[in-house]
A protein has these predicted regions:
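Glycine-rich phosphate/pyrophosphate-binding loop and the adjoining helix
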Residues: 148-185
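Active-site-proximal loop->helix
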Residues: 40, 65-68, 95, 112-124
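Short, glycine-/small-residue-rich phosphate/pyrophosphate-handling segment
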Residues: 111-157
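Glycine-rich phosphate/diphosphate-binding loop of Rossmann-like nucleotide-binding domains
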Residues: 15-59
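Short glycine/serine/threonine-rich phosphate/pyrophosphate-binding segments
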Residues: 32-36, 61-63, 83-92, 111-114, ...
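N-terminal beta-loop-helix "entrance" segment that forms/cooperates
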Residues: 52-74
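Glycine-rich phosphate-binding loop
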Residues: 67-105
Length: 185
């Protein structure tokens, strides 16, 4: 990602600095943290404060309940929950809160992440989890920012700049590839 002209975390309309985490990241084990680095990279780039917690739906259900209560009290706007294997954490969180939950299924285990993906996308009626692709931590960060942009105008502008940058990168790649193709013809 390229740096852009946004230098502060202030909301453009109000001028207030956002001092609380807007995004919470939940992961069931420290072993999975390295697969989520891109979330932090994206949120830092867009100047969105976040926090991360180790929460396991099956191994620490009481902690999961406390975690959700705390997030609601803090005013967190989006939760990103990751998991591998049965990956019940995103669904459990979604069943206990009205805060939007983004699920990130992680590769691993016998089915190489397919069980995680299916667990997240097959949620029952009324308990949605916005599920990303396997190991799509980057897209989870972007999607969280898009949700936040509905409330925080500075993010909408930053996302527009980011999309323009993606477009420019494709154009640059096309020019380079076309040039190399002509040289080898």
């Amino acid at each position: 990602m390229k740096k852009d002209s946004f230098a502060t975390t202030k909301e453009r309309d109000s001028g207030k600095t956002i001092k609380r985490p807007l995004v919470a990241i939940a992961v069931p084990s420290t072993k999975l943290l390295s697969q989520l680095n891109e979330i932090k990279t994206v949120l830092d780039f867009f100047q969105v404060l976040s926090e991360i917690s180790i929460v396991a739906a099956h191994r620490s259900p009481k902690k999961t309940l406390r975690f959700i209560d705390e997030l609601e009290r803090k005013g967190v706007n989006v939760i990103i929950a990751a998991g591998s294997g049965s990956a019940h954490l995103p669904g459990m969180i979604a069943s206990l809160t009205t805060i939007p939950v983004i699920g990130v299924p992680l590769r691993g285990g016998t089915l190489d992440g397919m069980d995680s993906l299916l667990s997240m996308i097959q949620m029952p009626h009324g308990v949605p989890v916005g599920t990303m692709g396997l190991n799509s931590a980057y897209n989870a960060g972007i999607f969280a920012c898009q949700i936040l942009a509905l409330k925080y105008p500075y993010l909408k502008e930053k996302l527009k700049v980011h999309k323009e940058t993606l477009e420019e990168e494709v154009e640059d790649e096309d020019r380079l590839q076309s040039s190399e193709w002509r040289q080898h013809s």
